From Swiss-Prot:
This is GDSL-like esterase Rv1075c. Induction: Induced under acidic conditions. The keyword Hydrolase applies. Optimum pH is 9.0 (with pNP-acetate as substrate). Residues 293-306 have a biased composition (Basic residues). Keywords: Hydrolase, Serine esterase, Signal. Residues 1-21 form the signal peptide. Changing residue 244 to A: Strong decrease in activity. One of its GO terms (cellular component) is plasma membrane.
Length: 314
């Protein structure tokens, strides 16, 4: 999600450029942007991170060094949602949940590397991928979560999707399995007033559709997070949003991570011919207490032990 709502200022400018008939709408949207900035805080705090090697059994993460072996290298690219901004613990971060899930169900040693940066747009993701290729070899698997900041920056829908496709294609050309969580639905953020929220929703849906087509064409696997999770955000906002009412909460991240994990697991196991060992509860899977249904409020989240880095010596 973007660090601050700039949707109205950009959108108002776009509307104003189409003619004086939109002057009233422009003034309204600018006013709403001013209000949104007073209730949506900037993202100053660094999200928790626990990069390293994960193994079956839910034990503490092992800090990776050159002498530490691993079977599958997983990289996370994208914006604040990819970093897990708003999470209180590393065990709530999407990358950690996905890495633990892969370790549990494949029995492989999963190395997690997070390249995502808070506030990134599709342009930023291209930079993340560029930097990765400079530093070292590409991963075996990549997860990208991107789109919201392209909406707030009023980046073009087509160019944003094409930049994402270029990143996916580069990773796929080097043998990586790529799963993309497409643009979230900004229309669920009640801190953004109407009609600004409706405009954000419309552009977000358009971008998600364009991303889906572009990612498929580039050989990646798109996961429509906005479409799949928006109903839950609308039904349970007090549970799905973090304290800033803007970024996802730990249960929301868990749902997103589960969707991405399933897509990545299927694609990765097909590529590497890895047998799957189903577990009763995947790391990060939201579980319901008796009396709750799948569509009612989730009461708790089953989590493994905290991801504490273990020195490997040397």
């Amino acid at each position: 999600m973007p660090r601050r709502s700039t949707i109205a200022l950009a959108t108002a400018g776009a509307l104003a450029s189409t003619g004086t008939a939109y002057l009233g709408a422009r003034n309204l949207l600018v006013g709403q942007a001013t209000h949104a900035r007073t209730v949506i805080p900037k993202s100053f705090d660094a999200p928790p991170r626990a990069d390293g090697v994960y193994t079956r059994g839910g034990g503490p993460v092992q800090r990776w060094r050159r002498e530490v072996p691993f079977d599958v290298h997983l990289m996370i690219f994208g914006d604040s949602t990819a970093t897990g901004y708003g999470c209180a613990s590393a065990e709530e971060v999407p990358g950690v949940l996905i890495a633990r899930g892969l370790a549990e169900q494949t029995g492989k040693r999963i190395r997690l590397s997070t390249k995502a940066i808070v506030g990134a747009t599709s342009k930023g993701v291209c930079g993340q991928v560029d930097a990765m290729f400079v530093v070292g070899p590409p991963p075996d698997a990549a997860v990208i979560m991107i789109g919201a900041n392209d909406i707030t920056a009023l980046n073009g829908i087509g160019p944003s999707a094409q930049r994402l496709a270029d990143c996916v294609r580069r990773l796929r050309t080097r043998g990586a399995v790529v799963v993309v969580g497409t643009c979230p639905d900004l229309g669920v953020i009640t801190a953004i007033p109407q009609p600004l929220r409706a405009l954000a929703h419309t552009r977000g849906v358009r971008l998600a559709r364009a991303q889906t087509a572009a990612v498929k064409a580039a050989g990646g696997v798109p996961v429509p997070l906005g479409h799949l999770l928006a109903p839950k955000f609308r039904a349970m906002p007090e549970l799905m949003f973090s304290a800033d009412r803007y970024h996802p909460s730990a249960p929301a991240y868990a749902l997103a991570a589960d969707l991405l994990f399933l897509a990545l697991r299927d694609a990765l196991t097909e590529k590497l011919d890895i047998p799957i060992h189903e577990t009763p509860s995947r790391p990060g899977t939201a579980t319901l207490e008796p009396g709750h249904t799948r569509h009612s409020m989730m009461s708790r989240l089953r989590r493994p032990r905290p991801a504490r880095a273990v020195p490997t010596g040397g």
